[in-house]
């Protein structure tokens, strides 16, 4: 599955930045906002909800 990262949990990361981002929540079946610290994390991290939906909509 090319977009298997859509199933990964939201990861804030180790840095202390404040970046509102979106991730695909598999339990809710939709993209939701979380706060990203600015480093680390995984690919389930999108700048816009539109990008999140376009990438992970089929899960």
From Swiss-Prot:
One of its GO terms (cellular component) is extracellular space. It is found in: Secreted; Nematocyst. Pfam families: Kunitz_BPTI (PF00014). It comes from the Eukaryota. Disulfide bonds join 6-56, 15-39, 31-52. The keyword rRNA-binding does not apply. This is PI-actitoxin-Aeq3a. It comes from Actinia equina. The lineage of its organism: Eukaryota, Metazoa, Cnidaria, Anthozoa, Hexacorallia.
């Amino acid at each position: 599955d090319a977009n298997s990262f859509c199933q990964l949990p939201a990861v804030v990361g180790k840095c202390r930045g404040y970046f509102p981002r979106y991730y695909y929540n598999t339990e809710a079946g939709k993209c939701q906002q979380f706060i990203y610290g600015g480093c680390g994390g995984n690919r389930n991290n999108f700048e816009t909800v539109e990008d999140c939906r376009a990438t992970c909509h089929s899960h």
